[in-house]
UniProtKB/Swiss-Prot annotation:
CDD domains: Ribosomal_S15p_S13e
Keyword annotations of the record: Ribonucleoprotein, Ribosomal protein, RNA-binding, rRNA-binding
Keyword rRNA-binding (UniProt): yes
Subunit structure comment from the entry: Part of the 30S ribosomal subunit. Forms a bridge to the 50S subunit in the 70S ribosome, contacting the 23S rRNA.
Protein name: Small ribosomal subunit protein uS15
Keyword rRNA-binding: yes
Length: 87
């Protein structure tokens, strides 16, 4: 993921003009990185170092989503729909 892609994600999911680190933005960025790394692992199935990094990212995203679900359920639901998560 390059800076341009990251900026687009931040602009799409930010809450206000100066927001770059809210839970919503962090989850969106992690989701993009997870999807990119998943494609990489399909091409390189024996890349175990990247697989471990993927597992860490998935765990971090899960924790952020759990926090968001507790603190702001409406935002959680809209984020899940926008990112097409949870089946």
């Amino acid at each position: 993921m390059n800076q341009e892609e990251k900026k687009k994600i931040i602009e799409q999911f930010r809450i206000n003009e100066k927001d770059t680190g809210s839970a919503e933005v962090q989850v969106a960025i992690l989701t993009a990185r997870i999807r990119h790394l998943t494609e990489h692992l399909k091409a390189h199935p024996k890349d175990f170092h990247s697989r471990r990094g993927l597992m860490k990212m998935v765990g971090r995203r899960r924790k952020l989503l759990r926090y968001l679900r507790k603190s702001n359920p409406e935002s959680y639901k809209s984020l899940i729909e926008k990112l097409n998560l949870r089946g």
